[in-house]
Amino acid sequence: MKHSNRTRSIDLRPLGAGLLALALALPGVANAQEKDSFRIAWSIYVGWMPWSYGDSAGIVDKWADRYDIEIDVVQINDYIESLNLYTAGEFDGVTVTNMDALAIPAASGVDTTLPIIGDFSNGNDGVVLKGTDDLMDIKGQRVNLVELSVSHYLLARALESVDMTERDVTVVSTSDADIVGAFSSEGVTAAATWNPQLSELRSMPNASVVFDSSDIPGEIIDTLALNTEVLEANPDLGKALTGAWYEIMARMSSDDEVGIDARTRMAEAAGTDLSGYESQLASTQMFYDAADAVDFVTSDQPEDTMENVRQFAFERGLLGATASSPDFVGIEFADGSVLGSEDNVKLRFTSEYMEMAAEEAL
């Protein structure tokens, strides 16, 4: 099975200032103008495969034509590279988790809006131990994971749930490509990762998932992010992408031949089969209905989640060397409230476009 490219980690301490300078120097990022051609970057992950299908099935083009614009949906093989390219202004939008949206473009000064909340991980990310099914037994162990990733965040939340901290374990930085091989070796007894690697780890002898993202529902969120200035100058981009997304959702969530074909094509594009893809969907809380996504983004959940995320990011230097507190980057929510600096809002949750979809107003 091909491993997911949803690597979702980067050490931004030496990178943030350079990305900020580059982003501000590029046209199309600062002082965005009205235009009719756009580029969206996506990478392989269960919740983002709909963009592959929407592109190949002509759904994105159909909705772009409706608003008399062009949208080029581009697969980037490396997730972090896609975020760096977006942050540098080479793309108008990108598929991204909530944590990385804060830690990469927002922390680098690129004002970013999340018009589509696609899903949240509901078991796709987990902590695995050998020889025990009790999370308490993690104390004193070496835990292999992709450092500064959502797996690292998940470990921190797992430890917090049993009144421990990272001082009670030793984090061993391990790439997502190496995590399965590492865990299969005799000397490795603990790991944190995401699917499809997680499914491989849990199937190994004497291995148990002792904590997963279903224990913190709604905290690892998968989104489509757009440059705020580009979106404000070109609201038809948000309308076209949202319209396309929910047409794709309607197709892939159906049990008829159209739905099976859509999920099969997504599976093939992800390097797996229909069964493998559907097993990943089973641990993903997809928002197939726009109204459900609106309910989620207008609830208290995003603010509660981002409080945890920004503390994690600040404590590990992900908000940049100049950040003196977690308040450095302001985060705006659907009701207009702001967490952090109101003078430096760089990440925005919104229900505007999903509400249009729910009301069939696109």
PLM regions and their residue ranges:
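Bacterial N-terminal signal peptides
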Residues: G16-P27
